[in-house]
Amino acid sequence: MDGRLFKDELLYCEGKHKPWFRGKIHLASLVFLPVAVYYISFSNSPWVYFNLFGNILCFGVSGFYHTFEWSPSTELFMQKLDHQAISLWTVTMMTPIAFHLFPTETRVKFLTILLSTFIANSYATWTSQPSTILASSIPGTLLLFSGECWKHMDSMEWTCMLLAFAFQSSGTVAYVLSNKGYRLCGNDTIYGYHELFHTATLFAAYFVYMVNYTIAVREPRFP
């Protein structure tokens, strides 16, 4: 094989189906970057900027990969980089929670599991052995510590975290349906399940941003 991520799937340069909105949703989302930077400037937390970097990388790579035309070798690399960026974004979205809300012992346990799932999924990505379950285990790490989140988050942060999980989970379902060849509406020439996945990730990113912003601007409970 030529190292493609999904062995039985065509590349875009080989004629893979691509609705008009494919990639453009994530690319357009970058216009909100100045607003995001403005609000987190009220925080001295480096971890919130780390989360913002993850957002820029994830949506930037996704937007460029899906929107523009690439040579076969470049597209193969961009495809894996796209999935790698999603994994890193998932890590960065939870890092502020670990450093601002969790006590040291809990933080160490959380980061150990989180980084282990990230490394495992990264290896699977670059060796062309992708797994939705393995990828989902990265954000799933936070569910193991939901009791700690409940204990240390305020009501708005808790609600935003649940909404982020709801949107990301629904997006994952849409992504799986897209990979299995299901069509959302007719031939999906404009908008399909993969675009629904991209839309859901934007809502998830917004609610995660709100969680990280609010915990960063208030006094950390566990320095």
Predicted regions and their residues:
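Multi-pass alpha-helical transmembrane bundles in non-GPCR membrane proteins
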Residues: 1-223
